[in-house]
A protein has these predicted regions:
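Membrane-interfacial amphipathic/re-entrant helices at transmembrane-helix boundaries
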Residues: 1-22, 49, 60-72, 98-102, ...
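Inter-helical junctions in multi-pass inner-membrane proteins, predominant
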Residues: 1-17, 170-177, 201-242, 265-278
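Single transmembrane alpha-helix segments in multi-pass membrane proteins
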Residues: 4-55, 86-102, 244-250
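Helix-loop-helix "hairpin" substructures at the membrane interface of multi-pass membrane proteins
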Residues: 14, 145-227, 250-255
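Hydrophobic core segments of alpha-helical transmembrane domains in multi-pass membrane transport
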Residues: 47-52, 73-83, 108-118, 157-168, ...
Length: 304
C-alpha cells in the first residue's frame, strides 16, 4: 500500500510536467490545426536556459532560492517565447497555405536544428545540477517503507494547476482568448471580421513556448539532470497526452499528462522499466482506435 502510494505521488508529479508541455501542443493545434513538433525541443531549450541562468546567478552571488528561481523563470520563459515566435515565423507562417505536410516537415527540421544547436553549444554529456529545493513531508511509514512528498513535487503540482487556471481564464474571459476561440472556429472568417489572425497565432506560439520553458525548469529541478535529447521523448509523450486528453482542450491536456505519467511510473515500478515507453505509447494507439477525439475532445463538425 505504501509503495503504491509513493508511485501515485511520483506519477502525478511526472504527469503534471507532461501536462504543462501538452498545453502548448493543444493550444497551437486548436488554432491552426497543426502539431508543432518543435515544441518538445523548446521544452529542452527551456531546461538548458534555466540551468544557464541558475549557474550564472550563483556565480554573481545571487543564491537566495526564491529570487534565483523568479529571475530564472523570467529569463527562460522570455527566451523560450522568442524561440516559439521564431518557429512560427520561419516554419509555419510561410507554409500556412501550402499542402498539409509542408509545415510538419518544416517543424521537424526546426526540431532537429534546435537539438543540434544545443548539442554543439552545450555538449552531448548529461548536465547535472544539485537540488535547490530539498526536503519534504513524510506521509507514512509502513513495512519499513517511508512515503515521501517532496517540496519540489508540491511545487510542480501547484504550478501546473495555477497555469491551467490562468490560461483557462485567459481563453474564456479576455479579448485575446476570444480571438483564439474565433480563430479556432474559422480562421478565415475571423480574419474577415477584423481579428489580426497572424498576431493571434504568433501569441499562441509564444505562450505555448513560455509554458514549455516552465516545464523545462520544473524538470530540471525535479530530476537534476538534463541533456540535449530530453525534448524528443518528453515531447512525444506530451503529444500523446494531448491526444489522449482531447487535443484542443486545456483540461484534457493536463488530464492526459496525468494518465501518461501514472502509466509510466506504475509500469516502471511493477514491470520492466525497459518497456515503460512502450506502455506509454501504446496508450496513444489504443486512444486513436477507441477514442479518436480523446477523453475531453469534441468531435469535429465538417462544414459543407
Amino acid at each position: 500500500m505504501a509503495y503504491a502510494l509513493q508511485q501515485l505521488i511520483n506519477g502525478v508529479t511526472l504527469g503534471m510536467i507532461y501536462g504543462l508541455i501538452a498545453v502548448g501542443y493543444t493550444m497551437v493545434y486548436g488554432i491552426i490545426g497543426m502539431i508543432n513538433f518543435a515544441h518538445g525541443d523548446i521544452f529542452m531549450v527551456g531546461a538548458f536556459l534555466s540551468l544557464i541562468s541558475l549557474l550564472g546567478l550563483a556565480s554573481l552571488g545571487i543564491t537566495a532560492v526564491p529570487l534565483a528561481l523568479a529571475l530564472t523563470l523570467v529569463f527562460a520563459a522570455g527566451l523560450a517565447a522568442l524561440y516559439g515566435w521564431t518557429v512560427e515565423r520561419v516554419a509555419y507562417r510561410p507554409l500556412r497555405e501550402s499542402f498539409r505536410l509542408a509545415p510538419l516537415i518544416s517543424a521537424i527540421g526546426m526540431s532537429i536544428t534546435l537539438q543540434n544547436f544545443v548539442q554543439v553549444s552545450q555538449g552531448a554529456r548529461v548536465k547535472p545540477m544539485e537540488a535547490l529545493i530539498p526536503g519534504g513531508i513524510q506521509l507514512m511509514n509502513r513495512d519499513d517503507f517511508a512515503v515521501q512528498l517532496s517540496w519540489m513535487q508540491i511545487a510542480i503540482v501547484i504550478t501546473t494547476l495555477l497555469v491551467l487556471a490562468v490560461f483557462t481564464w485567459l481563453v474564456t474571459k479576455t479579448p485575446l482568448g476570444r480571438s483564439m476561440r474565433a480563430c479556432e472556429q474559422d480562421l478565415k472568417m475571423a480574419s474577415l471580421l477584423g481579428i489580426d489572425t497572424d498576431k493571434t497565432i504568433s501569441l499562441t506560439f509564444v505562450i505555448g513556448a513560455a509554458l514549455a520553458a516552465v516545464a523545462g525548469l520544473m524538470f530540471l529541478l525535479y530530476y537534476g539532470v538534463i541533456d540535449f535529447y530530453i525534448g524528443f521523448i518528453a515531447g512525444v509523450k506530451a503529444f500523446t497526452a494531448a491526444v489522449l486528453g482531447g487535443i484542443g482542450s486545456l483540461p484534457g491536456a493536463v488530464l492526459g499528462g496525468l494518465l501518461i505519467g501514472l502509466i509510466e511510473v506504475f509500469w516502471s515500478a511493477y514491470f520492466s522499466v525497459e518497456y515503460k515507453d512502450v506502455a506509454a505509447f501504446s496508450i496513444l494507439v489504443v486512444a486513436l482506435i477507441f477514442m479518436p477525439t480523446g477523453i475531453l475532445g469534441r468531435a469535429e463538425v465538417e462544414k459543407v
